Amino acid sequence: NQIRVLLNNGFDIGIHTKSHPFCNKLEFDVLNEEIIASSRRLGKKFNRKVNFASYPFGARPSFNLEKKLITKSQIQVLLGINSKITNEREPFKWERDKQDSSYNSVNWLRFNCLPYLKYLL
């Protein structure tokens, strides 16, 4: 019931996977099943499209597998980290993702600069 209250108040929900594996060690078909099965189950329960997924342990697969997963599923955002979680880890470090070669300067300006310019204008 708490999740329904959040959804009714404009919050969104995401998934974590079906069986909590280390996703950086999975082949695409298994990774896809982990994400899709969890997404379908949650989406069906709350009659809502699930757009977000977070990797267990923060363990991300390769960039190409992530790109393929986003292309073939309804997931739009995949959250994870590329390094181990330890007490020495900087909690506010923002990890950068690799960019696809098709991500040109126009797209870079559109997605990285324009959102900030709107606040300045």
Locate each region found by the language model.
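Histidine-centered divalent metal-coordination motifs
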Residues: 16, 20
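Acidic (Asp/Glu)-rich catalytic clusters
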Residues: 1-14, 44-46, 88
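C-terminal active-site subregion of NodB/CE4 polysaccharide deacetylases
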Residues: 25-52, 57-121
